[in-house]
């Protein structure tokens, strides 16, 4: 069962989302809010697995709310709900640590599936946003191998992150304790100069596309 918290400033939209997601036996809507302030007060108490956040809110925006919530609840997964798409908005969502974004005209069943996918640890990110993130991460050091400072084990870990695996799944693959994997992930993110595993996953995925077969992470 995936616990979901909804943040949207339109009550009619929230009611529709509650009815839609609540009808799925695998989803449990544990709370809702209409503003950033309400969300910051209610989400920690509700302890959801996934927070569905509207981009436009009366006292802020869903991107900043995502960043603030994740700073307090690192295991939370955020799904950004937007009425439009742009490379800049998608990049902002990734950099804030969001696990994905969906456009508001998405079909009901697809939204429920997206929430469950994010709750299961998978990322819903656009290839264009991934490419934009890569360009930003490379910057002036584009000619330098971004993996040069990583050990073989860290490269393996990066590849598994790109598959959207959870710490437990990675632990099983690498024959390590789950707590050890968590520590390794933190160290890997520090080396890459990133804050969220989602960023590392996007980085690794795009790196695989830009390199010859067999020369990835």
From Swiss-Prot:
Induction: A member of the dormancy regulon. Moderately expressed under aerobic conditions, it is strongly induced in response to reduced oxygen tension (hypoxia), low levels of nitric oxide (NO) and carbon monoxide (CO). It is hoped that this regulon will give insight into the latent, or dormant phase of infection. Expression under hypoxic conditions, but not aerobically, is autoregulated. Member of the Rv3134c-devR-devS operon. Phosphorylated on Asp-54 by both DevS (DosS) and DosT. Phosphorylated on Thr-198 and Thr-205 by PknH, which enhances DevR dimerization. Aspartate phosphorylation and threonine phosphorylation cooperatively enhance DevR binding to DNA. Gene3D superfamilies: 3.40.50.2300. PROSITE patterns: HTH_LUXR_1, HTH_LUXR_2, RESPONSE_REGULATORY. Disulfide bonds: none annotated. Disruption phenotype: Strains deleted for this gene show hypervirulence upon intravenous inoculation in the mouse and DBA/2 model. However contradictory results were shown for using a devR/devS deletion strain in rabbits, guinea pigs and C57BL/6 mice. All studies agree that deletion strains fail to induce the dormancy regulon genes in response to hypoxia, NO, and CO. Deletion has no effect on expression of dosT. This is DNA-binding transcriptional activator DevR/DosR. It comes from Mycobacterium tuberculosis (strain ATCC 25618 / H37Rv). The lineage of its organism: Bacteria, Bacillati, Actinomycetota, Actinomycetes, Mycobacteriales. The gene is devR.
